[in-house]
Curated annotation (Swiss-Prot):
This is Sensor protein QseC. InterPro entries: HAMP_dom, HATPase_C_sf, His_kinase_dom, HisK_dim/P_dom, HisK_dim/P_sf, Sig_transdc_His_kin-like_C, TCS_sensor_his_kinase. The keyword Ribonucleoprotein does not apply. SUPFAM superfamilies: ATPase domain of HSP90 chaperone/DNA topoisomerase II/histidine kinase (SSF55874), Homodimeric domain of signal transducing histidine kinase (SSF47384). Member of a two-component regulatory system QseB/QseC. Activates the flagella regulon by activating transcription of FlhDC. May activate QseB by phosphorylation. SMART domains: HATPase_c, HisKA. The chain crosses the membrane at residues 13-33, 162-182. Residues 34-161 are periplasmic. Residues 183-235 form the HAMP domain. Gene3D superfamilies: 1.10.287.130, Histidine kinase-like ATPase, C-terminal domain (3.30.565.10), Sensor protein qsec (1.20.5.1040). It catalyses: ATP + protein L-histidine = ADP + protein N-phospho-L-histidine. It holds the Pfam family HATPase_c.
C-alpha cells in the first residue's frame, strides 16, 4: 500500500497545500527575480547614462590637473559610501587615462570600440562589470562609467526578498489556519463515522447529512439507500423464515404421521402402500410449498429486472397453453386460447412472465370442476384467464392474492402463494392484476398494462 493511502485526509490536504504553496512561492520568486533584475538593470543603465553625460559637460581641458584625482569623492548610496556603486574614468583619444574616481576607476582598462554599453573586467579582477562608453562633444575624450554586476544582482535580490519574505513568514500562520479549518470542516465526518460505529445492524434510521460537505453528501445518501435495502431484505428474510416455519409445520407433521402409519402397517401391504402413496403426495406438496416460498422470496428481493427482452405475448400464451395441456387433459378440462389481437409485444423477463401465466392456468385448472373449460383471451392491452367454475364469494374476493390465503372449505390442496407470485411478477413488469367473477359465470383474472 502506498504511503499516501495510509495517511489521513487532513494530512493529505495539508501536504498538498504545502506543496502547492511551495511551488507557487518558488515560481513567484523566480518571476519576481527576473522582472526585478530587468527593472534594476534598466534603472542603473539609465543612471550610468546620466552620470556619463554629466561628466561630458565638464571642462575637459582642465583634466590634466593631478589634484582632481586625489580629491575625487566616492559615490554615496543610501547615505553610506559604497565602492561598488559607480566608477568612472576619462581617457584621451589615444587611450591615456586623464581622470578617474580615485578608486575602481583607475583599474578600468581602455578597450573602447564604440559608444554604448559593454561588459568587461577591471585590471587584475575577475568580477564582471557593466560599462558605458561615451565620446565628448569634440571627440577628444573617451568617458567610461562602470558598475559591478554583483552589485546589481544584490540589489535585485534584496528587493525580491523584501517582497517575498512576508509571505514566507505568513506560511506557518496560513498552515495553522488551514488545520483549524480542516478540523472544523471534517467534524461532521467524524460524527458520521461515530454514528456508523454505534449503529445497530437492524436500524433503518437514515444518517443525518446535516453539515456534511456537498462532495460527501452523495455518499451519505447512498448509505441511507443501502441501509433501507438491507432493512427491507432483513424484513423479507424474517418473514420468509416465519412463513416457512408456519406453513411447513402442518405438512411435516402429516409426513410424520404417514411415516408412522407405514411403520405400523406391519404385514398389511395395502395399508403400507396407501400410507406410502400419501407420504409421496405429502412430499410433493411440501416440495411445491418450498419452491413457491423461495420463488416469492426471490421476487421480493428484486427491484429491477435483468435479462429483459421483447416478448410476443401471443407466443407466450400459446407456449403456456401447450405446457398445461397434459395436466388439463388428465383433469378432464379443456383449455382454449382466443387471440383478439396480434403482434402484442411487451418488454419483460421471459421466465417470470411464463411463470405468471403458468400460475394463472394452474390455479384455474385446480379449482375448476371436471368437464369445464378454461378460456385464455389476448387483447391489445390485456389478457384474461377465465374458468366456468362456481366463482368466488364477494367477501372472499378482497383476500384473493394475499399470501397463504386459501378460501375456507376448499378440498383442493395448495399453499395460497400462487396468485401472490402472479401479483408480484405483474408489479415488477409495470402491470396490474385484478381478480373477480366473470359476467358469464366463473372466476377470472385480468392482467393489464
Amino acid at each position: 500500500m502506498k504511503l499516501t493511502q495510509r495517511l489521513s485526509l487532513r494530512v493529505r490536504l495539508t501536504l498538498i497545500f504545502l506543496i502547492l504553496v511551495s511551488i507557487t512561492w518558488a515560481i513567484s520568486s523566480f518571476v519576481a527575480w527576473r522582472k526585478t533584475t530587468d527593472n534594476v538593470d534598466e534603472l542603473f543603465d539609465t543612471q550610468l547614462m546620466l552620470f556619463a553625460r554629466r561628466l561630458s559637460t565638464l571642462d575637459l581641458n582642465e583634466l590634466n590637473a593631478p589634484q582632481r584625482m586625489a580629491h575625487t569623492p566616492k559615490k554615496l548610496k543610501h547615505g553610506h559610501i559604497d565602492d561598488d556603486a559607480l566608477a568612472f574614468a576619462i581617457f584621451s583619444a589615444d587611450g591615456k587615462m586623464l581622470l578617474h574616481d580615485g578608486d575602481n576607476g583607475q583599474d578600468i582598462p581602455y578597450r573602447y570600440r564604440r559608444e554604448g554599453f559593454d561588459n568587461g573586467y577591471l585590471k587584475d579582477d575577475n568580477d564582471l562589470w557593466r560599462f558605458l562608453w561615451l565620446n565628448s562633444a569634440d571627440g577628444k575624450y573617451r568617458i567610461v562609467v562602470g558598475q559591478e554586476w554583483d552589485y546589481r544582482e544584490d540589489m535585485a535580490l534584496a528587493i525580491v526578498a523584501a517582497q517575498l519574505t512576508p509571505w514566507l513568514i505568513a506560511l506557518p500562520f496560513m498552515l495553522l489556519i488551514l488545520l483549524l479549518l480542516l478540523h472544523r470542516e471534517l467534524r461532521p465526518l467524524k460524527k458520521l463515522a461515530q454514528a456508523l460505529r454505534f449503529r445497530s445492524p437492524e436500524s433503518e434510521t437514515p444518517l443525518d447529512a446535516k453539515g456534511v460537505p456537498s462532495e460527501v453528501r452523495p455518499l451519505v445518501e447512498a448509505l441511507n439507500q443501502l441501509f433501507s435495502r438491507i432493512h427491507s431484505m432483513m424484513v423479507r428474510e424474517r418473514r420468509f423464515t416465519s412463513d416457512a416455519a408456519h406453513e411447513l409445520r402442518s405438512p411435516l407433521a402429516a409426513l410424520k404421521v404417514q411415516t408412522e402409519v407405514a411403520q405400523l402397517s406391519g404385514d398389511d401391504p395395502l395399508s403400507r402402500d396407501k400410507a406410502l402413496t400419501q407420504l409421496h403426495a405429502g412430499i410433493d406438496r411440501a416440495t411445491r410449498l418450498v419452491d413457491q416460498l423461495l420463488t416469492l422470496s426471490r421476487l421480493d428481493s428484486l427491484n429491477n429486472l435483468q435479462d429483459v427482452a421483447e416478448i410476443s405475448l401471443e407466443e407466450l400464451l400459446q407456449s403456456a397453453v401447450m405446457d398445461i395441456y397434459h395436466p388439463a387433459q388428465q383433469a378432464n378440462i379443456d383449455v382454449r386460447l382466443q387471440l383478439n389481437a396480434h403482434d402484442v409485444i411487451r418488454t419483460g423477463q421471459p421466465l417470470l412472465l411464463s411463470l405468471l401465466v403458468r400460475n394463472l392456468l394452474d390455479n384455474a385448472i385446480r379449482y375448476s370442476p371436471q368437464g369445464s373449460v378454461v378460456d385464455v383471451t389476448l387483447h391489445a392491452r390485456s389478457f384474461t384467464v377465465r374458468d366456468n367454475g362456481p366463482g368466488v364469494a364477494p367477501e372472499i374476493l378482497t383476500h384473493i392474492g394475499e399470501r397463504f390465503y386459501r378460501p375456507p372449505g376448499q378440498s383442493v390442496t395448495g399453499s395460497g402463494l400462487g396468485l401472490s407470485i402472479v401479483r408480484r411478477i405483474a408489479t415488477l413488469h409495470g402491470m396490474t392484476v385484478s381478480f373477480g367473477n366473470a359476467a358469464e359465470g366463473g372466476f377470472e383474472a385480468v392482467v393489464r398494462w
